[in-house]
Each structure stands twice: as C-alpha cells, then as structure tokens.
C-alpha cells in the first residue's frame, strides 16, 4: 500500500536520489545537472508544499507544489513529480497527482498548470489527460533529449 505524507527532513536524501535518477535518465526533466542534498534542501524550502509517497517504509516518489508565476499569476499552481524508476506503472504517479490536486485546492489555488510535459512521455500524457487536464499548447522542439533530438513539449492546464 502506498501512503502519501508530508516531506520530512529525514526524506531529503531519498528525494534527492529520486530527482537525480530522473535527471540522469534524461527523458522528462529539463534539468541536466544532479543536485546535492543541500541544493535539494534549498529547492524544497522554496516550495509551497512537498509530499512523499512511501511503500514499506521506503520513499518511492514525491512531488512539490509552487506558484506557476509570481504576483498576478500566483493563483495557478505548478508541480514537479518524481517517481522512482523501479516503481513506475504501479499507480504511484496517479496517487501523487491526485494528492497534489487536493493539496493545491486546500492551499487556495484556482488551477494547476504544467509547462513542459514531453509529448513522447506517453504515461505522463495519459495521466494528465485522464485527470481532465487540457492540452493548451505545444512548443515544438522544446525539450532537448540526451541524444540531442528535439522533442515537443505540451502545456497542460486544469481548473481546480
């Protein structure tokens, strides 16, 4: 069973490792450089909320929510999701997504927007569309893959 709870200081190494594995994989995150634990701590501290997915006392995923834009755009949330590579296609991403939508509502956000969903990331595209996100645009070649191929990215939005 997957439990989703607030991120705790003891989770920092696990969340850093999750993030860095996805960066290294090179298929979905814009970041190219791994983060130190201190850099991840700083990143998490700058977010409005961070949660982790835990199974058998092991952190297997996480997400963090922040304002998509400052000031007059701060009523729209954005979030980043990390699911351990060995825990994909097991419902972890969906559980994190559903939890994040509920959390964003509680925090008073009016919508959720994702600015860079790689169009070839079929599980992610399927997840967001199944959760009633609408694709509001495409940026042709907006993601430079590790093989130097340029892939399209989609912008998704859902009212809360």
Positions of PLM-derived features:
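Hydrophobic adenine-recognition pocket in adenosine-nucleotide-binding enzymes
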Residues: 7, 83, 117
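Helix-loop element at the rim of GNAT/NAT acetyltransferase active sites that forms part
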Residues: 17-33
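A short beta-loop-alpha structural element at the N-terminal edge
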Residues: 2-15
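Acetyl-CoA-dependent GNAT
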Residues: 28-86, 97-98, 103, 159-160
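Conserved acetyl-CoA-binding loop-helix of GNAT-fold acetyltransferases
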Residues: 89-104, 126-130
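Conserved GNAT acetyl-CoA-binding A-motif
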Residues: 104-117
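Conserved catalytic-core motifs of GNAT/GCN5-like acyltransferases
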Residues: 115-117, 129-151
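Short hydrophobic/aromatic beta-strand or adjacent loop that forms the aromatic wall/cage
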Residues: 48, 151-155
């Amino acid at each position: 069973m997957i439990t989703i709870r607030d991120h705790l200081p003891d989770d920092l190494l696990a969340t850093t490792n999750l993030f860095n594995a996805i960066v290294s994989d090179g298929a979905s995150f814009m970041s190219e450089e791994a983060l130190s634990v201190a850099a991840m701590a700083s990143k998490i501290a700058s977010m409005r909320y961070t949660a982790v997915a835990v199974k058998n006392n092991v952190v297997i995923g996480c997400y963090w929510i922040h304002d998509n834009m400052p000031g007059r755009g701060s009523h729209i949330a954005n979030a980043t999701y990390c699911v351990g590579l060995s825990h994909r296609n097991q419902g972890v991403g969906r559980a994190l997504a559903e939890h994040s939508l509920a959390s964003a509502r509680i925090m008073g956000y009016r919508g959720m927007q994702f600015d860079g969903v790689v169009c070839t990331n079929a599980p992610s595209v399927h997840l967001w569309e199944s959760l009633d996100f609408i694709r509001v645009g495409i940026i042709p070649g907006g993601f430079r893959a590790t093989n130097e191929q340029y892939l399209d990215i989609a912008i998704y939005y859902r009212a809360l």
